[in-house]
Amino acid sequence: MNAVLELDKTVVRRGGRAVLQVEHLSVIRGEVLAIIGPNGAGKSTLLRILGLLDRPTEGTVHFRGEVVDWRSPLVPLRRRMASAFQEPWLCDATAFANVALGLRFRGLPSPAIRERAGHWLARFGVGHLANRQARTLSGGEAQRVALARALVLEPEVLFLDEPFSSLDQPTREALVDDLGMILRQDHVTTVFVTHAREEALALGDRVAVMMDGQILQVDAPTRLFRAPISERVARFVGVETILEGRVVGQQEGIAVVEVEGQKIEVACRATPGATILFGLRPEDFTLASPEGLALASSARNHLLGTIVRLHPSGALLRAVVNCGFFLTALVTRQSAESLGLEEGGQVLVAFKATAPHVLRADLDKEGQTL
């Protein structure tokens, strides 16, 4: 792996308290590293360290394999980077002048400035707005100009700090799609901070989860969202049903787990007597009428429960079902209507033995690792 940026044993202290503790983090050349976490997790602090804007209290930062010397002038290194933020922060000038500004500071000749600024405005779909005053642009148009202004510099690293959070959903989705295409086509090394899981999935080659100033997991998006390494990560990435039970049987890689008197089959090699913690995502469940006890599917688990809450979740409905413990499932509005789902009504919940993701498994009675 060719790392552009690396942190080793990096700590930031404020008022005697550690607000950032990163044992190791690398940013690989050409990748988009998405950093997600709740507000106050330390994401922006981490971004400022990676961008060489703030010096850590402890630890080292490497850029292109060299240890950053904080006593030396850092402007030459910072000029190899670019940023875009939640607010576009455009100058009171035309869209073209805003994109051209950094090139003028670098002393490029006018023909080169015209060519590069025009090229990037066009790539972000705002070439026709080149002569518009920035103050007359919509939020989405202004953010496209801000991103063009950053990428026109051809930075070695692009930093994005919540660049979509102030946009409405249709505008945000369109810009995420367009930016993702550009970053992939040009292999732009990018560190992208967001609290939106769907944005991390759409853009990230890898995703880092931050909480309380620490990075808890770094992984490919599909693996992180399907296989979080802890309960805290699982809850943050949307694993809404987390259950704990005792293994009461095992056969051919399928453990029978007792949870609040219910038997659940889980694809894992935990041995009888062990306690496991596992999670299920809302989309793992299939809902059916109580009469459909013999569902024509490969699901090995069928639980009868009562709907305690049914509420909208975007284009779908989110159903909270009490099966002796609570499960959260997603269902289409059409399915809910055809099944006659309503709060207080009964429903059959089905899911495969491969759906549960084991978050923790205790040792068995012989002390063997599960």
Model-identified regions with their sequence ranges:
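Helix-to-loop junction immediately C-terminal to a conserved catalytic motif
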Residues: 51
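Conserved ABC ATPase "signature" region
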Residues: 111-129, 180-181
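A short, proline-enriched helix->beta-strand linker immediately N-terminal to the Walker B motif
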Residues: 152-156
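Conserved ABC ATPase signature
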Residues: 133-137, 141
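The feature captures the beta-strand-to-loop junction immediately N-terminal to the Walker
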Residues: 36-38
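ABC ATPase NBD coupling module
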Residues: 67-82, 105, 224, 228
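Glycine/charge-rich catalytic "coupling/switch" loops of P-loop NTPases
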Residues: 261-311, 330-370
